[in-house]
Amino acid sequence: MSVISMKQLLEAGVHFGHQTRRWNPKMAPYIFTERNGIYIIDLQKTVRKAEEAYNFIKEVSTEGKDILFVGTKKQAQDAIKDEAIRSSMHFVNNRWLGGMLTNFSTIKKRIRRLSEIERMQEDGTFEVLPKKEVIKLKGELEKLEKNLGGIKNLDCDNIGAMFVVDPRKEKNAISEAKILGIPVVAIVDTNCDPEEVDYVIPGNDDAIRAVKLITAKMADAIMEGRQGEELAE
């Protein structure tokens, strides 16, 4: 039994690709047909590829490695955050800051600043500070939380894989992963280059339900892998 069924994929609209004029010819092997000017993705291939990705993510998780979820487009933001939290993983869903992985020591300073302001908020410091100062700090906290909240506890050396929604949009994240030798699993639509990705899941990266379905499956794989890790111990 496959980890994801054709019925689930159809219901979520995973098969709808982009308009035929906006395509990457390298995606041809994953295209089933063309309908009303839109490419239809071959869901049999999606089933197979999703299974490969699932097994890989499960294996990475069993080894005790972390998976970083990345998806900053509107349709992906909630699923990326919710599923990363559900599987106790890390995520970037607002903006990929240059050097997030390749210059992590600098990013770490910003994370420390985030923790510092959070502590001030919790220990009552805000109550004794001038109102103007508190407003300024709250604004800074909100911005830091938005960009770095999902990687507060990230250990850059322990990332075993990156899961990406829309490799075209997240090309900077992918290039940093490549530099560090981190394998990339991604939902790849008909306008993307599959060669940029190690584990391609051909599918619609613009429909919220489609993104949620596949992202949730990757979170399931992590949780299954973690169970295996606990049993091995």
From Swiss-Prot:
One of its GO terms (molecular function) is structural constituent of ribosome. Disulfide bonds: none annotated. It comes from the Bacteria. GO terms for biological process: translation. The lineage of its organism: Bacteria, Bacillati, Bacillota, Clostridia, Eubacteriales. One of its GO terms (cellular component) is cytosolic small ribosomal subunit. The keyword Ribonucleoprotein applies. This is Small ribosomal subunit protein uS2.
